[in-house]
Amino acid sequence: MEKPSIYELINMVEQVNNASIVQYTDSLSKSIGISSIIVLSEIKKRKTCQPIELAKKLGYSKSSITAISNKLIRASYITSIADPHDRRKTYFTITTEGMDILKEAEILGQKYYETIYSVLTEEELAQYVHIQRKLLYYIKQ
């Protein structure tokens, strides 16, 4: 097998990621992006959190978190609550509407996962995840 160029590798990864995201988000009943779903999921896990916590945990810039959270607030998926002791601090909490869209996303995500990744054996899937984590760890060093 001929060694692929860095451009071919990046293009291949990008095509897989983009196609996966489009197929997955197109199946949702509401128009919501994958980044918004990831942020919603993290807010749900934490119950309440500050924007800076989300940025650090998810590896997003502060401005990206601001843009995503503004969309989520407008869609009534999260609320922003000011800290009564320090007005500069705000906390996000997930709303009932946010829980509903996240539940739908999780159900569709599981179906998508079972469909797309069914072409891989359990061993191949474990290797794929291991390789992705290894590369991500190395890139972040």
Labelled PLM ranges:
Residues S29-S36, T95, S118-E122:
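Short helix-coil-helix linker/hinge
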Residues I38-S41, K56, R74, T79, ...:
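A cross-family signal for key residues in well-ordered alpha-helices
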Residues V22-S61:
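N-terminal helix-turn-helix DNA-binding core of bacterial DNA-binding proteins
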Residues E104-Q141:
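Terminal interaction helix/tail motif
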Residues K3, R74-T79, V119, Y138:
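Residue cluster at the C-terminal edge of the helix-turn-helix DNA-binding motif
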Residues M1-K30:
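N-terminal leader segment of winged-helix/HTH proteins
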Residues K47-T90, T96:
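Canonical helix-turn-helix DNA-binding module
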